[in-house]
């Protein structure tokens, strides 16, 4: 069993990993909540379609697929943040960036899941009654999914940038 020895300084306090871990938790918890809500809400519409027109059930599964992808965004961000937290040097600056990245991905995923659930429920019911609405439903789902994708991209940028140094550097600037 190996023990991770961290350097503890003013820039890298012992509690820094707590904030990074909260980012990891927020990322997976909120994206899974969003995906679960989107799946549950759109499943109500799919069940209704199954009673009215059973031949449309397979076409009605798109909202469930879109909602499931949201959880994958959270999982990927969790893995990236976990790699950051498990480094021997973990600055408070890096920890706050990781917390922000987790919250960004998680809350965008939650909003996206809610949007997918509501538009998916109404969309599959409407498309069962009027098949011309199917393309409109897909466009609504794509833009709803894009909300989670935006949060995912911003979270990856936040996780990849920032200073993780535990040593203060003196910057010298020359003025003319």
UniProtKB/Swiss-Prot annotation:
- Its domain of life reads Eukaryota
Which CDD domains does this chain map to? ATP-synt_Vo_c_ATP6C_rpt1, ATP-synt_Vo_c_ATP6C_rpt2
Q: Which GO terms describe its cellular component?
A: proton-transporting V-type ATPase, V0 domain; vacuolar membrane
List residues in topological domain: Lumenal.
1-17, 84-98, 158-176
Q: Where in the cell is it found?
A: Vacuole membrane
Cytoplasmic-facing ranges: 39-62, 120-136
What's the protein's topology in the membrane? Multi-pass membrane protein
**InterPro entries (alphabetical):** ATPase_proteolipid_c-like_dom, ATPase_proteolipid_csu, ATPase_proteolipid_su_C_euk, F/V-ATP_Csub_sf
GO MF assignments: proton-transporting ATPase activity, rotational mechanism
Give TM regions: 18-38, 63-83, 99-119, 137-157
Record's keyword terms, sorted: Hydrogen ion transport, Ion transport, Membrane, Transmembrane, Transmembrane helix, Transport, Vacuole
Locate the site labelled Essential for proton translocation: 145
Q: Which proteins does it associate with, and in what oligomeric form?
A: V-ATPase is a heteromultimeric enzyme composed of a peripheral catalytic V1 complex (main components: subunits A, B, C, D, E, and F) attached to an integral membrane V0 proton pore complex (main component: the proteolipid protein; which is present as a hexamer that forms the proton-conducting pore).
Family that this chain belongs to: Belongs to the V-ATPase proteolipid subunit family.
Q: What does this protein do?
A: Proton-conducting pore forming subunit of the membrane integral V0 complex of vacuolar ATPase. V-ATPase is responsible for acidifying a variety of intracellular compartments in eukaryotic cells.
Instruction: Indicate what this protein is called per its UniProt record.
Output: V-type proton ATPase 16 kDa proteolipid subunit
Q: Which organism is it from?
A: Entamoeba dispar
Question: Per UniProt, what is the name of the gene that codes for the protein in this document?
Answer: VMA3
């Amino acid at each position: 069993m190996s023990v991770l020895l961290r350097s503890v300084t003013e820039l890298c306090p012992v509690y820094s990993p707590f904030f990074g871990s909260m980012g990891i938790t927020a990322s997976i918890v909120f994206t899974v909540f969003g995906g679960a809500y989107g799946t549950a809400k759109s499943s109500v519409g799919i069940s209704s379609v199954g009673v009215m027109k059973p031949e449309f059930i397979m076409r009605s599964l798109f909202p469930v697929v879109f909602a499931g992808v949201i959880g994958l965004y959270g999982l990927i961000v969790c893995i990236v943040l976990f790699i950051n937290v498990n480094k021997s040097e973990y600055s408070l600056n890096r920890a706050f960036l990781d917390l922000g990245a987790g919250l960004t991905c998680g809350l965008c995923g939650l909003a996206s899941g809610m949007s997918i659930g509501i538009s998916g429920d109404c969309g599959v019911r409407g498309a069962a009654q009027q098949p011309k609405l199917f393309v409109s439903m897909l466009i609504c789902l794509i833009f709803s999914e894009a909300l989670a994708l935006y949060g995912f991209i911003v979270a990856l940028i936040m996780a990849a940038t920032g200073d993780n140094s535990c040593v203060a550097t003196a910057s010298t600037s020359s003025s003319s």
